[in-house]
């Protein structure tokens, strides 16, 4: 009997700018409605999440600005590169997100797209608060300080 693989062989698409531009508060996994050529293109890692965000319209959540390159062998059945893609969430989850976005002025940001059990495409969305310029500068200074400390510790351990 062949063992099933737990982890997918595909590395996820990650939005690296999300942590820099937003203070991420909570995360949520959602399914996404895609066409066949979009799934094949994502398996080839041809997606871009940099400017992707989610919007709630009429009780449904849509992922905007998520760019998936056309599949190279798609032919006439290829998909448009950028279009609103529906996210699959339970009604209570959508209502909770809608309350957070309306009351607290938070935004929904796509942070990761990955394959679950090598079959289904999932999107990790985060509820976040946009950072101001001085917050970004503070984060960069903290990161630089941590790197200096790590570098100093590494060099001091080298000579012992």
From Swiss-Prot:
Membrane-crossing segments per the record: none
GO-annotated cellular components: cytosol
Localization of this protein: Cytoplasm
Keywords: Cytoplasm, RNA-binding
Any single biological process term in GO: trans-translation
Classification via InterPro entries: SmpB, SsrA-bd_prot, SsrA-bd_prot_CS
GO-annotated molecular function: RNA binding
PANTHER family documented for this protein: SSRA-BINDING PROTEIN, TMRNA-BINDING COMPONENT OF TRANS-TRANSLATION TAGGING COMPLEX
UniProt similarity note: Belongs to the SmpB family.
Biological role: Required for rescue of stalled ribosomes mediated by trans-translation. Binds to transfer-messenger RNA (tmRNA), required for stable association of tmRNA with ribosomes. tmRNA and SmpB together mimic tRNA shape, replacing the anticodon stem-loop with SmpB. tmRNA is encoded by the ssrA gene; the 2 termini fold to resemble tRNA(Ala) and it encodes a 'tag peptide', a short internal open reading frame. During trans-translation Ala-aminoacylated tmRNA acts like a tRNA, entering the A-site of stalled ribosomes, displacing the stalled mRNA.
UniProt protein name: SsrA-binding protein
Protein species of origin: Leptospira interrogans serogroup Icterohaemorrhagiae serovar copenhageni (strain Fiocruz L1-130)
């Amino acid at each position: 009997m062949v063992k099933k693989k737990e982890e997918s062989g595909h590395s996820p698409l990650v939005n690296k700018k999300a942590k820099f531009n937003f203070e991420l508060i909570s995360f949520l996994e959602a399914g996404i409605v895609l066409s066949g050529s979009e799934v094949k293109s994502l398996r080839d890692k041809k997606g871009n999440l940099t400017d992707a965000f989610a919007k709630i319209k009429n009780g449904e959540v849509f992922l905007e600005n998520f760019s998936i390159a056309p599949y190279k062998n798609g032919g006439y059945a290829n998909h448009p590169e950028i279009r609103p893609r529906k996210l699959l969430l339970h009604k209570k989850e959508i209502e909770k997100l809608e309350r957070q976005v309306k009351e607290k002025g938070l935004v929904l940001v796509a942070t990761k797209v990955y394959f679950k059990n090598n079959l289904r495409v999932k999107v990790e969305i985060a509820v976040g608060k946009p950072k101001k310029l001085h917050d970004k500068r503070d984060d960069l200074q903290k990161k630089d300080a941590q790197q200096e400390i790590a570098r100093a510790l590494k060099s001091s351990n080298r000579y012992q």
